[in-house]
Amino acid sequence: MTLFSLFLYLLAFILLIIPVGKHLAKIIMHEKTVGEKIFSAIEAPIFKPVKCKCENMSLKNYLVSFLVVNLAMYILTHGILAMQGNSPSLAFNTAISFITNTNLQHYSGEWLNGTASRLALINLMFTSAASGMAICMAIIRGVMGIRLGNFYEDIVKSVTRLLLPASIIAAVGLVICGLPQTFDTQTVVKTVEGGYQVIALGPAATWEAIKHLGTNGGGLFSSNSTHPFENVSLWSNYIAVSYTHLTLPTI
């Protein structure tokens, strides 16, 4: 890496961290953010079924809500992984590691059975990061001596107002760079030697975007970001490092 390339990485990071940090601060303090009307319209049907009034919670209720939500998501994800042909031990390890945001990659990405399994893990990459952010928000408010807030409100807004918009921008950029974005798990191609080869595919752009934003370690492919479908060019590396992997985790 040349000094100029390193400068570009740091420049993009420095330009992004201040506005993103201010946006996150508004979410923490329950202030109106950019696109407030749009986000509120998106969040309303999410809160309504669970009858969430976004009332302030006690420390006990906040922690219980955190545990219940994550337990429910673990059970759902473990069930999906198991029903799609993954071994019980692999389903347990993968679900636990993704929901705790540690993302041990004991699975072989190319042979991760089923599109539903991949979508379930993408969901956990959003919710595990959002759960951690919600707990951090509560700690910050507690240190400031103000009310802790509502866990359901914090986790939803972490996704709708930060993780999801940032992931969409990153995913579009990665698709432009050449990363595959498809629900097909594989394709068969004819090689120059006349034989046939099975090439694994998947929603790589979506996966990579939230993988880096949420500091998740599990890759869509076995070799993770060294695989050409996860990091196809210098520009995709800029997006992965400067925009997603440095900005939000640093804040």
Indicate residue ranges for each PLM-predicted region.
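Generic structural hydrophobic/aromatic packing signal, biased to beta-strands
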Residues: 13, 80, 119-125, 139-140, ...
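Glycine- and acidic
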Residues: 5-6, 46, 121, 137, ...
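Juxtamembrane interface at the ends
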Residues: 26-33, 135-141, 218-225
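Membrane-interface helix-loop-helix modules in multi-pass membrane proteins
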Residues: 16, 62-142
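Hydrophobic alpha-helical transmembrane segments of multi-pass membrane proteins
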Residues: 7-11, 67-68, 123-130, 159, ...
